[in-house]
Each structure stands twice: as structure tokens, then as C-alpha cells.
């Protein structure tokens, strides 16, 4: 007998905006989505701000979205947690941070603060860097150096200069700190083993090699002059009198203030991992602190904020009922449907199968907007025909990853490719008498231009996301309004005929 699978399809970066201008979601020809939208119950969910455990007004992101969906409750994000501790003062007694600074003071070595310089709040926040500078000042440190990774992706593409000026003003006001290097996140924050990029960022920080400039402002202005926006700033060493302001040396303390792990792992391994094989380099022996736990297998680092653990996430609970589940995505979003969806747990649940489809190797995804959506779909259809799975979690990366390029025509093509796949998947699920829920983790592709400047917009948005209930049982029924991402899991469990565990504080969205 065929199983009646319950599937959640996450259209990554597919938000809802009433504004049609620069809206790739509205501009795309998506007959399958429209057909399902018109026939089946649907509502909108909040995917940003307080509803997902972020500060008010803060745009959502993929990690936060998948954590909230998988947990079935609002998960207070590291961003909110750390900001709160800075305000309350407990940040300044954090054991790992204090220890790194005390060691630098005792050994008369340097303190290096590295991370993404913006207020994007996806990977880092400039306020956390300011908090570290204040702590360094309190500790009486003088040799404090910032290695700034330029953003231009979670914030406007050329906003980096403003963040450099803001940082320089803060350092002047606090009375400590100098910028030693700047690197675009394309180099310093790769997550696809493109070691030739990471090596350039490493060489700037550890060897003082790379582009040269006499100030960070000069470096970024030159980059703009060369038509390279923040994300793509070549790793640049700031010099004084022909010598690097600072480089990371043995015995120094290093604090990496990014709180999101996925794009922090590679450069961290390059600096500290004795088994590192990405490129030839001399291993540094430093006191290294990760703001959060980037990787359990990294044993040679301290962690300032260890993960909070969550029991009875959707995957764990479904597994405890003896049911089979599948997680499927291409490389760019594989960690999201596995690690993040499971509440930051790497280990698969019992009877949880995983299918990883390789993302295409292209410089930027506007060059291949369909990415690997067709391959993901083929694999998924094969798996559905095995009649093995009770629950399937699927992610299509395209609207987000192509949305990040700022190229609207490509984002439209990305959504059209996904719509084609969505149609095939929906037909197959309905053929199996299953249920398909369609949603997104946050917005992106529905706003491809910055309305204030008319320039391309590459960042996420705070827009709501769709939630569709596609099933023979759903016809003629309705969903509640006013929901959030944390309400998806309780809704899915209800459809699966399972009791919602008490840890899930989200609400079932089915109107009785």
C-alpha cells in the first residue's frame, strides 16, 4: 500500500510583497503555484522580527527560518541573545571572551577581532564588535586589531564604507582598536570549499600579503573605483609606513564575532585546524574564540555562546513515533534542512534519510538560475515512488540564492524553474494521496531593487511568506491568519494524526 506522505516544500527566499516593482516573484510566470494557490487553502506567515526570535523589524534568514520551522516554537536567535547580554552587562563577564583578553594582556600579545562588518544581523552585528572593543578597553588592552569582512549581501552592496566609518568613529570614542585588514565575504566567508578564495583572506590576516592600502576607507574606495562592491573586495592589508598594521601571530588571541556557523567554519579551520588540507599554510597557534559553536569537531577553540538544546523538534518527534523521513536539498541549503531544521544537531534522527544534490559550480548563480532544482526534483520523485517516507522536508534554494545576485531577470528565471518542479512534485504527492505544504523561510526575490536608490537589492526582506495546504482533504477548508513559521510543525503533526508535543508552543493553523 502506498504511504500518504506529508511533505513540506520550502521555497527559499520566496516572500510576498504588494509592490510589483522589482518583484521577481510577481513577475515570474508560475502557472503551477497559481493553480494550487487558487484551488487550496492558503495564508501568510510572519518570517521576521520577534515572530522568529529576532529583534523587532530584523529581516529573517535561512538559518533562523529553518530553526523555527523545525522546532515548532520561537527560537531566540544568537543575535537577540548576545545583544540582550551586552545591554544587561553579562556579555562583559563571558568566560571565553574574558579569558582570551586576559591571556593577551598577560602575554603582551595582540587581540584580533575578525568578522562581518555590518548591521545585517544574519551572520554578525556591528554592535557585537563594539561590545568587544568596550571589553578590550575595560581590560586595558592596547594592541587590538580588527579584520573586517565586508558584507554587501545582507545589506546594500556598497554600504561598506559607511560601516568602516562607523567602526572607526566607535574605536576613536572607545579609545582602542585599529583596522588591520579588510576582505569581501566572497573570500573570507566561503562555505563551498573554494579554498583559493579563503587562502587570499587568510594570507592578508596571517601573512600581511595581498592588496595594500594606507587606510580601510582608501581600500574600499579603490574597490568601488574598480567596480567591486563590498562582497567582492579583494583581501587588503592596511599598512603604516610600508608595514602591515598587524597580522595574526603565534600566541595572539583571536575572537571571531560572527554568530552564524556555516560561513565561519572554513576560515576558522584555516587558522586553527591541525589537520587542515585546504591549501598550504603554516599552522598558527593562537587562543581562538568562536562567538558560537561553529563545528563540534573543532576542539582547539573556545566558544563564547554554546548552543541551547531543543527537545522534540519536528524531526526528533516524528522519529520517536517510528516513522520514516527524508530531507532533500542541494548543497547551498542542505545544512538548513538537516542541521538547522533539527535544532542545530548534526546527527540524523533514526530513520531519517538525507539526499544531497550538488549545487552547480558557477561563480554566481545568476549564470545558472535553475541551479540544481531539476536534479533535486528527479531524485525526490524517485524517492516518492519508493513509498517509504511518512514525512519529507524539501528546500528549493533558487529564489534566495539567485535573489542574492541582485539580477532580476535571473531571479524571475529561477522562480519559473522552481514552479515547473513544484508542479511535478505536487502532482506526485496528490497521486499518492499525500499532503503538500508549501512555504518559505524568509523573503528575498520579491524585492530585487532598493526603492530608495533604484539600485539592485541583494538582501533578505521582512515580508511575510506564503503557506499553502495542498491535499484532497484540504479542498473547501481554510487556514488561520496571523501565523508564524513556528506554527508549521504543529500543523503538519495534526495532519499526520499525531499529538503535538508540549515543547512545541506554535499553533496548529487548520481551521476546525
Swiss-Prot record:
Substrate binds at residues 123, 153-154, 185, 191, 260-263, 333. Pathway: Carbohydrate degradation; glycolysis; pyruvate from D-glyceraldehyde 3-phosphate: step 3/5. It comes from the Bacteria. Its cofactor is Mn(2+). GO terms for cellular component: cytosol. Pfam families: iPGM_N, Metalloenzyme. Mn(2+) 1 binds at residues 400, 404, 460. One of its GO terms (molecular function) is phosphoglycerate mutase activity. It comes from Clostridium perfringens (strain 13 / Type A). It catalyses: (2R)-2-phosphoglycerate = (2R)-3-phosphoglycerate. This is 2,3-bisphosphoglycerate-independent phosphoglycerate mutase. Catalyzes the interconversion of 2-phosphoglycerate and 3-phosphoglycerate. Mn(2+) 2 binds at residues 12, 62, 441-442. Binds 2 manganese ions per subunit. The active site is at residue 62. Monomer. Keywords: Glycolysis, Isomerase, Manganese, Metal-binding. PANTHER family: 2,3-BISPHOSPHOGLYCERATE-INDEPENDENT PHOSPHOGLYCERATE MUTASE (PTHR31637:SF0).
Amino acid at each position: 500500500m502506498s504511504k500518504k506522505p506529508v511533505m513540506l516544500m520550502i521555497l527559499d527566499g520566496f516572500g510576498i510583497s504588494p509592490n510589483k516593482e522589482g518583484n521577481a516573484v510577481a513577475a515570474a510566470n508560475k502557472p503551477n503555484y497559481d493553480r494550487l494557490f487558487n484551488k487550496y487553502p492558503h495564508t501568510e506567515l510572519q518570517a521576521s522580527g520577534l515572530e522568529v526570535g529576532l529583534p523587532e523589524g530584523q529581516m529573517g534568514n535561512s538559518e533562523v527560518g529553518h530553526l523555527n520551522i523545525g522546532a515548532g516554537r520561537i527560537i531566540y536567535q544568537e543575535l537577540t541573545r548576545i545583544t540582550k547580554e551586552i545591554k544587561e552587562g553579562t556579555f562583559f563577564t563571558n568566560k571565553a571572551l574574558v579569558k582570551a583578553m586576559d591571556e593577551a594582556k598577560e602575554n603582551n600579545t595582540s587581540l584580533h577581532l575578525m568578522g562581518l562588518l555590518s548591521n545585517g544581523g544574519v551572520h554578525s552585528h556591528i554592535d557585537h564588535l563594539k561590545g568587544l572593543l568596550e571589553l578590550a578597553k575595560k581590560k586595558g588592552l592596547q594592541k587590538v586589531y580588527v579584520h573586517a569582512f565586508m558584507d554587501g549581501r545582507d545589506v546594500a552592496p556598497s554600504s561598506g564604507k559607511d560601516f568602516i566609518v562607523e567602526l572607526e568613529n566607535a574605536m576613536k570614542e572607545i579609545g582602542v582598536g585599529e583596522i588591520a585588514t579588510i576582505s569581501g565575504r566572497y573570500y573570507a566567508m566561503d562555505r563551498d570549499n573554494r579554498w583559493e578564495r579563503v587562502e587570499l583572506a587568510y594570507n592578508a590576516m596571517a601573512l600581511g600579503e595581498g592588496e595594500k592600502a594606507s587606510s580601510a576607507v582608501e581600500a574600499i574606495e579603490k574597490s568601488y573605483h574598480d567596480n567591486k562592491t563590498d562582497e567582492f573586495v579583494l583581501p587588503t592589508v592596511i599598512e603604516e609606513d610600508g608595514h602591515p598594521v598587524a597580522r595574526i601571530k603565534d600566541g595572539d588571541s583571536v575572537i571571531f564575532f560572527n554568530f552564524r556557523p556555516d560561513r565561519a567554519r572554513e576560515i576558522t579551520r584555516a587558522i586553527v585546524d591541525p589537520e587542515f588540507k585546504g591549501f598550504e599554510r603554516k599552522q598558527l597557534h593562537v587562543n581562538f574564540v568562536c562567538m558560537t559553536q561553529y563545528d563540534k569537531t573543532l576542539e582547539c577553540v573556545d566558544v563564547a555562546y554554546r548552543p541551547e538544546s531543543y527537545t522534540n523538534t519536528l524531526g526528533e518527534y516524528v522519529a520517536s513515533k517510528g516513522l520514516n523521513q527524508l530531507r532533500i536539498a542541494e548543497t547551498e541549503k542542505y545544512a538548513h534542512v538537516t542541521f538547522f531544521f533539527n535544532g542545530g544537531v548534526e546527527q540524523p534522527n533514526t530513520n531519517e534519510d538525507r539526499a544531497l544534490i550538488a549545487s552547480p559550480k558557477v561563480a554566481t548563480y545568476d549564470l545558472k538560475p535553475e541551479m540544481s532544482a531539476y536534479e533535486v526534483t528527479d531524485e525526490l520523485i524517485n524517492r516518492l515512488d519508493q513509498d517509504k517516507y511518512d514525512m519529507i522536508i524539501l528546500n528549493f534554494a533558487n529564489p534566495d540564492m539567485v535573489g542574492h545576485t541582485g539580477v532580476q531577470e535571473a531571479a524571475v528565471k529561477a522562480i519559473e524553474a522552481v514552479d515547473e518542479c513544484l508542479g511535478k512534485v505536487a502532482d506526485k504527492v496528490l497521486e499518492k494521496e499525500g499532503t503538500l505544504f508549501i512555504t518559505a523561510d524568509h523573503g528575498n526575490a520579491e524585492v530585487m531593487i532598493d526603492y530608495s536608490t533604484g539600485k539592485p537589492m541583494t538582501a533578505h526582506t521582512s515580508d511575510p511568506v506564503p503557506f499553502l495546504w495542498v491535499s484532497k482533504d484540504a479542498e473547501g477548508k481554510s487556514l488561520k491568519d496571523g501565523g508564524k513559521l513556528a506554527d508549521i510543525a504543529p500543523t503538519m503533526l495534526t495532519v499526520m494524526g499525531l499529538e503535538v508535543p508540549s515543547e512545541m508552543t506554535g499553533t496548529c493553523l487548520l481551521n476546525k
